[in-house]
Amino acid sequence: MKRICSIYRSKKKDGMYLYVLKSDALERVPEPLMEAFGKAHHAFDMVLTPERKLSREDIAVVLENLDKQGYHLQMPPAEDEYIEHLPEELLRRNDPM
């Protein structure tokens, strides 16, 4: 199953993306979700197939959501996924005694 998909970036929340079928655009996305998502900025289009790898999403889930509800919402990564925490000794290295 091959789907041509448009991906929109949220202006409200960094790292939040909305996948929709290109032919439907944003028509099938519920209004409350669009309000929470904020202004949708078209990022790019891509062809999705079951064999395609996505960096942060399971392709099977994305395709299933597109078929069942007409969209897939990608949430931003949890803070721990993108912020490296430094060891305590490095944080205190330049502290005055």
UniProtKB/Swiss-Prot annotation:
It comes from the Bacteria. Transmembrane segments: none annotated. PROSITE patterns: YCGL. Pfam families: YcgL. Residues 3-87 form the YcgL domain. Disulfide bonds: none annotated. This is YcgL domain-containing protein PFLU_1517. It comes from Pseudomonas fluorescens (strain SBW25).
